[in-house]
UniProtKB/Swiss-Prot annotation:
The entry's keywords: Cytoplasm, Methyltransferase, Nucleotide biosynthesis, Transferase
GO molecular function: thymidylate synthase activity
Cellular location(s): Cytoplasm
Annotated TM spans: none
EC number(s) on file: 2.1.1.45
Positions with a binding annotation for dUMP: R25, R180, R181, R220, S221, G222, D223, N231, H261, I262, Y263
Ribosomal protein keyword on record: no
Protein name as annotated: Thymidylate synthase
The keyword Cytoplasm appears for this protein: yes
């Protein structure tokens, strides 16, 4: 059996030792390096972390959300997925329609002030409940703009209409697998100012060789402790799904990062993680009866023999 997370652990250690301390947009501060790469051989297993529990259900529902072309958190909340809550909540509390307690810089304040954290959690709970109960409210405040689902499946054309990049790349893999243009891009400069969070995953490129499908992701910004473990599992799952539709076997996931950073308030968690011995990586099971990515439901995707250490909690920087 293989332990596939070692490149991730090595990169964490390198950033802690060699990284540059910097200020950042969130006010939290980071330690980072610029330009890093990890490689994961998907034929040996599935590279989800074992040194801490990573909730695979959240990864499945988020990826299916992207592949639906959805940009509204309502679908995620229906699957008890709160990954994107903070960005939608930020839109709500900064709007003229919000008249509740002051939520300025709620991410940092909730870490430093226990009383405020309780107020923040109550406001977030009310927000989530209203998104689920009030469709008009969800349309207005649950939408995150042109994030991944929109860019992947509904890239707006200047002359009108849209491009479905995912379907295009699947068609190209089937017809011209040797192509060097098997690319999906999420970065549209025109949309960046209006997006809740400009795409961190700028583009990814597929590569076919000897019956195997690989992908390389370029990620402009990577939150190494919280975000990147999700990204590794999500794109590894994406490769497997598209490989099944195109009749190929999974090859490699190559993860290239621009600003690879650890937030200052994650240092203790990273140190704890690095003391843990990884287990063998699990295997991925996909329902063999599903032949198109649109057909997959949550129950069609499972991990087999996922043994892991306990959860390590850390705050999200917004």
């Amino acid at each position: 059996m293989a332990t596939l997370e070692q490149p991730y652990l090595d990169l964490l250690n390198k950033i802690m030792i060699e990284g540059h301390d910097k200020e950042d947009r969130t006010g939290t501060g980071t330690r980072s390096i610029f330009g890093a790469q990890m490689r994961f051989n998907l034929s040996e297993g599935f590279p989800i972390l074992t040194t801490k529990r990573v909730p695979f259900g959240l990864i499945k529902s988020e990826l299916l959300w992207f592949l639906r072309g959805d940009t509204n958190i309502r679908f995620l909340l229906e699957h008890n997925n709160h990954i994107w809550d903070e960005w939608a909540f930020k839109n709500w509390v900064e709007s003229d329609e919000y008249h509740g307690p002051d939520m300025t810089n709620f991410g940092l304040r909730s870490q430093e002030d226990a009383k405020f954290k309780q107020v923040y959690q109550e406001e977030m709970k009310k927000f989530d409940e209203r998104i689920l109960a009030d469709r008009d409210f969800a349309v207005k405040f649950g939408n995150l703009g042109d994030v991944y689902g929109a860019q992947w499946r509904h890239w707006q054309k200047r002359e009108g209409g849209f491009i479905d990049q995912i379907q295009n790349v699947i068609d190209q893999i089937k017809k011209t697998p040797y192509s060097r243009r098997l690319i999906v891009s999420a970065w549209n400069p025109e949309d960046v100012p209006n997006s809740a969070l400009p795409p961190c995953h700028v583009l990814f490129q597929f590569y076919v060789n000897d019956g195997r499908l690989s992908v390389q992701l370029y990620q402009r910004s990577g939150d190494m402790f919280l975000g990147v473990p999700f990204n590794i599992a999500s794109y590894s799952l994406l490769v497997n799904l598209i490989a099944q539709e195109t009749g190929l076997k999974p090859g490699e996931f190559i993860h290239t990062l621009g600003d690879a950073h650890i937030y200052r308030n994650h240092f203790d968690q990273v140190k704890e993680l690095l003391t843990r011995k990884p287990y063998d990586s699990p295997k991925l099971w996909l329902n063999p009866d599903k032949k198109k990515i649109e057909d997959f439901e949550m129950s069609d995707i499972k991990l087999v023999d996922y043994k892991h250490h306990g959860t390590i909690k850390a705050p999200v920087a917004v």
